[in-house]
């Protein structure tokens, strides 16, 4: 093309310079000035990496003074272009604008503009962009978003609760599963779903101080949710950046004590516009009508301001109906406003639970029971269903199930309360206790005697706590370097036990970090036993490494030595041998220790080894736990209640372990109390609530559906392709593991979701569960989600040129591959993507205006193509520019029909689904007071908004590829 002074060109290799103007010419060279940056570039006349900028009728262009022109005609005179059209700010028509007056900062965002301006991308990036569009659209359509990507086993009852609650608008529920059934994971799944769906953006978690790090670790490792921990120092720092420090972060964890201590802090928290509040250990919020505790009032104030509330408690309601009412009152103060009314309602509810038990038993129903069912369900056409349920016909079972569903919908607190018990959830191992009685060394006897004399002024509780750990008393007098492990018989016993069980993984838990560290040294030096240590002084990454070292089968540690606090929130189901080097102070901590191994997914019976020194507090406590509470071999829901009522007596026995008078009677009394409460619990078992919480077959089907989506081959192929193109280094390790590290030539300098020092990933859920240091990559993982955003929100792969070697077609045959996207813009919380995700429509146009996409599948077509360098690509584009314009116009008329059909289908689906949901909720509200008005209103508003936004859906060209046939 001949050059003329004043022509506008763009650099193919430095598009950031903007539009250049030809300012000097000679026989061999041309000079371009780039006014946007003030830089000059010298190019050879032949084969320079620059492209002529030419616009076409229908384009909108910008003048250097800031106004825009809709081009209607293009004139060329002496090699210079003049654009004629309508000025958009004044609507003046017939305005002429010479190309020299074009805005130099012009950027090309439309794929066709980038193609014609020579900003052509690589062919593999075009393919990645199309796949990203296709897979993203498919993922949006799949149900269970937010449940698939968690790094946890697919346990039906957990998935059922999370799915039920996570789908609701501003859920307000009480999660009351028994210990070891995974309430934290359920809460995490609900949070994850609410965040992914856009129903929540700001989440506050309030927990006891000792559980802060456990929650932080669980949210990060299982759900890739990075919470900020707010304590006094973090609060003071944030105060410098904002008048309300809590507005500086979206996801926050803090302790109940941190909130309780300061009135201003509480007000700031309440004003910080959270969407979801999660409170763990909610049974510690003491309440009575006359005097609610300060802790209760704090949570009550927050719950009034925050739309969604999840309360977590392991205490069954039968162990304190008043405190159970208090927790429900936090969730819905209008519904649960009077305690006496609540008690009366619960008594009415008893026959409902009995009726369900009867229906499930399969026995014939007496007339009085049939009448009761008729009254409880209160439907006009219930008679045929009752007859069918009581007959021997084939549909009797189905009729009974329908009646149970009707009862579930109408009665009790099943909308706000979920509780699973170990009786209702199968798959737990047995626990076997082995107590090993060892002599008390004279060194300890002396230290305890001296301590008794010198600590006479200590409180009974302080003395009791001291007496549990004789090695600490000894060190107190002999100094920190006192080598207690040389004479403590528990150490000798532990060494022998580990040597005898060389091939077993053993978890050893002790109360203090110092004990764990000293034991590790002894094991290493005396028997060369490989041990990992796990304590609160380690960072999360160091703990991950220690846990991975313990988990590794080949060259891993035989033993993991844990301190009490260090082990919180970590589970090691692959081990089944637990050694308690000492005992914890209360039954909750004991259950927490055993719970490290006693989880769903544990394949073996658990052997609990308790070496203890005779005539010490450990011996007393061991007896009380085992004989009084049966807490070693079975979970003990009654433990906290009995501990609280017998606390004074218990610490008296622990503080003076040699004075045993009355101990047998005390233990016997506790056992009676335990048995009595257990019977009460079993009688009060709420079958209806358990069925609702467990999810039954529906929950099984949900777990299977998600399991079927695991190991998606499309994900593995796409992820590896994405890592290659983004420029992430991949180092394959054994066991399906890949180490990802940033490289120096990435598409973006700091890839979101990829740590600076890299990370280990796997696509296998089981592998991720057994390796603490491996992240589980799914379509929901931040690396994949951020990768999709990176590709699709920018221009990566939006235009390309390829050659097709095919002797069956004439040389020079031109094909244009187009990817249109049909989408609707709307606030995230409306979840329009359920009905109309950004959906690609692929077209393959020939010069005759025929769309060949249906006959030519993308992947097989892509494999036949060859890449072209950028310079040759620009030349090809310039040669066929007019043809491509004509083919684009033909495609525009064809795509409209497909796009409108997609939009209509989405509108129909949304209307059907949301109207059905609304009708069901309204029908239930008429018979169940637990459905809040705001839930119905939110669903009605949501339906209207979804349909309005779908009506405004449109389509646009997202990517274009020019394909030219060659025979070489």
Curated annotation (Swiss-Prot):
<dbReference type="InterPro" id="IPR022737">
    <property type="entry name" value="RapA_C"/>
</dbReference>
<dbReference type="InterPro" id="IPR027417">
    <property type="entry name" value="P-loop_NTPase"/>
</dbReference>
<feature type="domain" description="Helicase ATP-binding">
    <location>
        <begin position="164"/>
        <end position="334"/>
    </location>
</feature>
<protein>
    <recommendedName>
        <fullName>RNA polymerase-associated protein RapA</fullName>
        <ecNumber>3.6.4.-</ecNumber>
    </recommendedName>
</protein>
<keyword id="KW-0010">Activator</keyword>
<comment type="similarity">
    <text>Belongs to the SNF2/RAD54 helicase family. RapA subfamily.</text>
</comment>
<dbReference type="InterPro" id="IPR001650">
    <property type="entry name" value="Helicase_C-like"/>
</dbReference>
<dbReference type="InterPro" id="IPR014001">
    <property type="entry name" value="Helicase_ATP-bd"/>
</dbReference>
<feature type="binding site">
    <location>
        <begin position="177"/>
        <end position="184"/>
    </location>
    <ligand>
        <name>ATP</name>
    </ligand>
</feature>
<dbReference type="InterPro" id="IPR000330">
    <property type="entry name" value="SNF2_N"/>
</dbReference>
<keyword id="KW-0378">Hydrolase</keyword>
<dbReference type="InterPro" id="IPR038718">
    <property type="entry name" value="SNF2-like_sf"/>
</dbReference>
<dbReference type="GO" id="GO:0006355">
    <property type="term" value="P:regulation of DNA-templated transcription"/>
</dbReference>
<keyword id="KW-0347">Helicase</keyword>
<dbReference type="Pfam" id="PF18337">
    <property type="entry name" value="Tudor_RapA"/>
</dbReference>
<dbReference type="Pfam" id="PF00271">
    <property type="entry name" value="Helicase_C"/>
</dbReference>
<comment type="function">
    <text>Transcription regulator that activates transcription by stimulating RNA polymerase (RNAP) recycling in case of stress conditions such as supercoiled DNA or high salt concentrations. Probably acts by releasing the RNAP, when it is trapped or immobilized on tightly supercoiled DNA. Does not activate transcription on linear DNA. Probably not involved in DNA repair.</text>
</comment>
<keyword id="KW-0238">DNA-binding</keyword>
<dbReference type="InterPro" id="IPR023949">
    <property type="entry name" value="Helicase_RapA"/>
</dbReference>
<feature type="domain" description="Helicase C-terminal">
    <location>
        <begin position="490"/>
        <end position="664"/>
    </location>
</feature>
<dbReference type="InterPro" id="IPR040766">
    <property type="entry name" value="Tudor_2_RapA"/>
</dbReference>
<dbReference type="GO" id="GO:0005524">
    <property type="term" value="F:ATP binding"/>
</dbReference>
<dbReference type="Pfam" id="PF18339">
    <property type="entry name" value="Tudor_1_RapA"/>
</dbReference>
<dbReference type="GO" id="GO:0004386">
    <property type="term" value="F:helicase activity"/>
</dbReference>
<keyword id="KW-0805">Transcription regulation</keyword>
<dbReference type="Pfam" id="PF00176">
    <property type="entry name" value="SNF2-rel_dom"/>
</dbReference>
<comment type="subunit">
    <text>Interacts with the RNAP. Has a higher affinity for the core RNAP than for the holoenzyme. Its ATPase activity is stimulated by binding to RNAP.</text>
</comment>
<dbReference type="InterPro" id="IPR040765">
    <property type="entry name" value="Tudor_1_RapA"/>
</dbReference>
<dbReference type="InterPro" id="IPR049730">
    <property type="entry name" value="SNF2/RAD54-like_C"/>
</dbReference>
<keyword id="KW-0067">ATP-binding</keyword>
<dbReference type="GO" id="GO:0003677">
    <property type="term" value="F:DNA binding"/>
</dbReference>
<dbReference type="GO" id="GO:0016817">
    <property type="term" value="F:hydrolase activity, acting on acid anhydrides"/>
</dbReference>
<dbReference type="Pfam" id="PF12137">
    <property type="entry name" value="RapA_C"/>
</dbReference>
<keyword id="KW-0804">Transcription</keyword>
<keyword id="KW-0547">Nucleotide-binding</keyword>
<feature type="short sequence motif" description="DEAH box">
    <location>
        <begin position="280"/>
        <end position="283"/>
    </location>
</feature>
